[in-house]
Amino acid sequence: MMLDPQIAARLKRNADGLVTAVVQERGSRDVLMVAWMDDAALARTLETREATYYSRSRGQQWVKGETSGHTQYVHSVRLDCDGDTVLLTVDQVGGACHTGDHSCFDADVLLHPQD
């Protein structure tokens, strides 16, 4: 799958050719996770609506939920003003975090809201 050249031209990738992907749950608006995408992962996500990312540690693409069953159906993808981050709005099935938690931001609160 090839990324549309008009979209590719707008992306500002890091030195490894990746863009940051912020993943937000459609219903709750919670931020679920942050991941990386290369052009091919973004193209596949746009084509299939299955959240597809790039694993820096494994050096390959992965489809969220392919092995765990904890899938992300992508409703929308937005590019930020700088072109270096995409925002995916998803329906999450199961936990988004590799720990099994609903969100990767469920564990450690560094600053609690004021009352």
Swiss-Prot record:
Q: Where does Mg(2+) bind?
A: D80, D82, D84
Supply the alphabetized keyword list.
Answer: Amino-acid biosynthesis, Cytoplasm, Histidine biosynthesis, Hydrolase, Magnesium, Metal-binding, Zinc
| Domain of life per record | Bacteria
Cellular component (GO) terms are: cytoplasm
Q: Which GO terms describe its biological process?
A: L-histidine biosynthetic process
Q: In Gene Ontology terms, what is one molecular function of this protein?
A: phosphoribosyl-AMP cyclohydrolase activity
List localization entries. Cytoplasm
Q: What main location does UniProt list?
A: cytoplasm
HAMAP family referenced in this protein's UniProt entry, alphabetically: HisI (MF_01021)
Assembly information from the UniProt record: Homodimer.
Q: Enumerate the PANTHER family for this protein.
A: HISTIDINE BIOSYNTHESIS BIFUNCTIONAL PROTEIN (PTHR42945), PHOSPHORIBOSYL-AMP CYCLOHYDROLASE (PTHR42945:SF11)
What function does this protein fulfil? Catalyzes the hydrolysis of the adenine ring of phosphoribosyl-AMP.
The record's similarity note reads: Belongs to the PRA-CH family.
Q: What is this protein called?
A: Phosphoribosyl-AMP cyclohydrolase
Give the organism, scientific name. Mycobacterium avium (strain 104)
- Its gene? hisI
